Amino acid sequence: MSASVLSVRDLTVKAHLDSGERILLDAVSLDLAKGEILGLVGESGSGKSLLCRSLIRLLPSSLLKIESGSVLLEGRDLTRISDAEMLKVRGGEIGMIFQNPTSHLDPVMRIGNQIAEGIRYHQGLNAREARAAAIEILGQVGFPDPISQYESYPHEFSGGMRQRAMIGVALSCNPKILIADEPTTALDVTIQAQILKLLMDIRDKRGLSIILITHDLGIVAQTCDRIAVMRGGKLLEDGPKRTLLSQPRHPYTIDLIKSHPSMPDETVPVAETAKDDAPLKPLLEIDDLHVRFNVGGGLFKGSGAKTVNAVSGVSLRLMPGETVGIVGESGSGKSTLARAILGLTPLSSGHITFDGIDLAQQRTAGLAKLRREAAMVFQDPYNALNPRLTIGQMLTEVLKVRGKVASADIPARVGELLDLVGLEREFAKRKPRSMSGGQCQRAGIARALAVDPQLIIADECVAALDVTIQAQIIELFRELTRKMNLTLLFIAHDLAIVRNLCQRTVVMHRGEIVEEGPSEEVFARPKHPYTASLIAAIPDIDPDKQLFAGTDLRGESSVAEILPFKRMP
């Protein structure tokens, strides 16, 4: 291994609160070699992001202090240099890529100018030179028309292109180290793979070092040279990725590896297929469904208005007790379809029949039955719950509206619902702010069960959760569908989860169903090129299964061909 460009020794960060001191980082030590990608993994709250912010002295609160330890950047201790020197280090020597580019790009400043600003500050170029350099960087990070796109604003780009712009801003100062803090968490699987390949190509061409923060072991297995595992502010273990993944020493690392959803493998059990004696009458039947929206055209929707086919000719059947997964990228129509099923989005044409009632022909009666018999679990567990109500009050409210449980029996039913979702009964007295994301999602599932539904629609309900919590929620769904004969429509962009949970998989692309079938068959022998592309883009925890495996999803020249980087001395 080459010499360390960054060496952290016994770094300790404490929070000084009115109630006393609290250790947030506990004597963390690690090394980053030149040209190396180090994966920093762990659940939310493990200290990953705080560690990286501590490296550049950007602690999120004045109550937090670096108490001891050292951060050596090529021999210089960053904990001891002046604030003026630290300003030059940030961006100039250590660049940062954040999780949500929308929050970190200036919404009223052109993309090109945001890159040029850093170039002028750190490299001392004039406006014309900085503009030329910024255009070159836009091309390097994959913008197809960098000259014209220089003038565009962040809101004019997709999430993936905004993340490319964020990488461009970080590269503008030619740093020695890039810190990428969950740079792909909010992105679709294919866009995620493109960003990861871009980071690897940048490393190869520029010779810089990267710290990649993530909670997904599949990502680090595919992209990183070494892995460091954190929990509770401590570094539990680190080492070469193959050694750590094949011979983990710490029980927590073992749990992380076991919790990672597996992709097609003969040794991994898949979801059970529907039973032969399943009723012939479908619970939900969708026939040639179309949902169209008019966009643009100004206040009066004039000649400039365009029609978007959000859902186009979708036909689908769900049998009682069946678990069906719908997968696809953002904009594929998954969530629009879910909202249409629940009557939250008007239908342009087609039919939705729920338990024998056609919602188009008997809308009032159909919606009344649907609201009684169907429920939804949302993506963001915090925003989906009323912050003013305790969990018990929230469940009581639903039970009263539902009207099936006598008032005297409601407290007992609340306790039963909490038991069903694996929460202790004392959670009835707690509000969402005092609960973790996984606990809030369990409460959201309890609320859905409170209506005693036949159908549950789960819309990206585990996307915001850590991998171990994801595994717990998936197992909860599996148990509930088995115990209660629930029909589950599970919407996700994570194919590995769908493959492990769902009996059937439906693949949507641009509003249409492009493939449908038993999960085992879809994943083992995909028929549509788009399905094959989605599967190829999933980072597998086995480092020998290469990302994309020869599949080019970009439809553009490879990143390696468009990155004329100069290697740093």
Predicted regions and their residues:
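Conserved ABC ATPase signature
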Residues: 152-157, 161, 431-435, 439
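Conserved ABC transporter NBD signature motif
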Residues: 65-77, 350-358
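ABC ATPase NBD coupling module
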Residues: 78-95, 121, 242-248, 300-305, ...
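Conserved catalytic motifs of ABC-family nucleotide-binding domains
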Residues: 174, 452
